[in-house]
Amino acid sequence: MTGTGTRATFGDDGVLIVVDVQNDFCPGGALAVPRGDEIIPIINSLAARFRNVVLTQDWHPRGHSSFASSHPGKQPFETVTADYGPQVLWPDHCVQSTRGAAIHAALDIPHAALIVRKGMHGAIDSYSTFFENDRKTPTGLIGYLRERGLTRLFLAGLAFDFCVRYSAEDARRQGFDAFIIEDACRGIELDGSVAAAHTSLAALGVPCINAQEFL
């Protein structure tokens, strides 16, 4: 990170990863994160400081196994046991090629070099931008970052306590320096999930920082 007056820019080893800023996760969407759209101006400002930006996109087929509608008698936000472990059931959301799955129109990052789609396998959910929830199926992002020497990862987006959290944790486990820009995130909050995220991130050495530190 280099300073220009009081403003910081990021060089060849830094990358901003913008997680799932999609219509269905913003107000009015099928799985809206409270005040999720408030982070978009912050992320746009952050992105202008980075040469390298990656977007992620939840991209589910119809009838995905994480949808409550795929489990007769079950309701959204109940938990079931999948082959890979506990799975929260969600409202149908981010269905491929629908408006809800689209990146929010207010997100203005024309130099974003890559969109990583996740959750495309019908029987496996994906919170992390690096692996599906079976912990075996990679998205390809690890190789992309390593090939380009991108070692410092700054994460922002939706939702803090799920996809942002698990992405940051996997980044750290893979040997990257990971930071969450917390005021550029919003959480869902299910049964203490925000507090659990903070505890887990701290244990792995993932700092939660503030966008104003370098805007």
Predicted regions and their residues:
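Active-site flanking residues adjacent to catalytic metal/cofactor-binding acidic residues
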Residues: 19, 57, 182
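Short, glycine/acidic-enriched loop or turn micro-motifs at the edges of active sites
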Residues: 23, 61, 121, 160, ...
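Histidine-anchored nucleotide/phosphate-binding helix
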Residues: 42-46, 164-175
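Short acidic-hydrophobic, aromatic-tinged amphipathic segments that line or gate anion-handling sites
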Residues: 207-215
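Short glycine-enriched, charge-decorated loop/helix-capping segments at active-site entrances
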Residues: 29-36, 129-133
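Short, flexible loop segments at boundaries between secondary-structure elements
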Residues: 179-194
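Active-site alpha/beta core segments
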Residues: 41-152
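Short, hydrophobic/glycine-enriched beta-strand segments
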Residues: 14-21, 25
